Amino acid sequence: MENGALNQGEGKDPSSFLSDIIGSRVIVKLNNSLVFKGELQSVDGYMNIALEKCEEWVHGKKKTVHGDAFVRGNNVMYISADDSA
């Protein structure tokens, strides 16, 4: 890591990158446009994701606080770091 920033790692596969950022805050956007923000707790080979301190966001506004959430990998459009935390 350089200057404390998350290094996406050139040549790394996505599951290795996600394993490296376990414990960090992430944004998960689903194929149906729902957005979840939370702390990444685990990811498996199917890209299934477990989040803690999870919040559901709709149209840029926090809708619901779920606490813990499990997201099935085939529903995920993208995962990114949550720099707003």
From Swiss-Prot:
Among Gene3D superfamilies, the record links this protein to: 2.30.30.100
Where does the UniProt annotation locate this protein?
Cytoplasm; Nucleus
Has UniProt tagged this entry with the keyword Transcription? no
Matches recorded under CDD domains: LSm6
Q: Which SUPFAM superfamilies match?
A: Sm-like ribonucleoproteins (SSF50182)
GO CC term (a single one): U6 snRNP
Q: Which UniProt keywords apply?
A: Cytoplasm, mRNA processing, mRNA splicing, Nucleus, Ribonucleoprotein, RNA-binding, rRNA processing, Spliceosome, tRNA processing
The UniProt entry's GO biological process terms, in alphabetical order, are: maturation of SSU-rRNA; mRNA splicing, via spliceosome; tRNA processing
Q: Which residues form the Sm domain?
A: 13-85
Q: What's one Pfam family here?
A: LSM
Disulphide-bridged cysteine pairs? none
Q: List the InterPro entries hit by this protein, alphabetically.
A: Lsm6/sSmF, LSM_dom_sf, Sm, Sm_dom_euk/arc
Please state which protein family the record places this protein in: Belongs to the snRNP Sm proteins family. SmF/LSm6 subfamily.
Q: How does it assemble?
A: Component of the heptameric LSM1-LSM7 complex, which consists of lsm1, lsm2, lsm3, lsm4, lsm5, lsm6 and lsm7. Component of the heptameric LSM2-LSM8 complex, which consists of lsm2, lsm3, lsm4, lsm5, lsm6, lsm7 and lsm8. The LSm subunits form a seven-membered ring structure with a doughnut shape.
Q: What does this protein do?
A: Component of LSm protein complexes, which are involved in RNA processing and may function in a chaperone-like manner, facilitating the efficient association of RNA processing factors with their substrates. Component of the cytoplasmic LSM1-LSM7 complex, which is thought to be involved in mRNA degradation by activating the decapping step in the 5'-to-3' mRNA decay pathway. Component of the nuclear LSM2-LSM8 complex, which is involved in splicing of nuclear mRNAs.
Q: What is this protein called?
A: U6 snRNA-associated Sm-like protein LSm6
Q: Which organism is it from?
A: Sclerotinia sclerotiorum (strain ATCC 18683 / 1980 / Ss-1)
Name the gene behind this protein.
Answer: lsm6
